[in-house]
Amino acid sequence: LGFMACVENMTRKIPGRLVGKTTDKKGKTGYVLTLQAREQHIRREKASSNVCSNQALCALAVSVYLSAMGKEGFRNVAVQCMSKAHYMAEKLGEIGFRLEYDKEFFHEFVTVSDISSEKILTKLEENNILGGLPLDEKRILWCCTELNSKEDIDEVINILKEVK
């Protein structure tokens, strides 16, 4: 699943289904497929939307989630993800991990350590924590989301302080 933004006059050229927000006769908010001429069931030969049922189910689930969160909720989740990832990167740096890339990042980042990735992740697993993704012997890809609390991150850091 992905999100794409474009200027209004390009909406007929981008791939995928477009969902629009509308209001019904009773003033209730509703979401509908817009520009249906792009859809397979209207103009198969020129369709820019090619979605199968399992993708549509994922899109429906995300639509419900995003609708429930609203505009500010979606932004708040993004801010939480970013701030928690930067917090974790900073804390990992304090205990000897180095950032692989000196670039901006959102909620995923790669660290390098003198301790083996396997040893680090095994120690976390022993504490019922699913750590990052090992990229090789010394590098790990970490990810933080809105579901990770600062207490969770601090617990990971405290456990990693014990790894030698």
Predicted regions and their residues:
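Active-site C-terminal subdomain of aminotransferase-like
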Residues: L1-I95, L99-D102
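Conserved C-terminal alpha-helix-loop-beta "cap" of PLP-dependent enzymes
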Residues: E72-E155
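C-terminal alpha-helix
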Residues: I159-V163
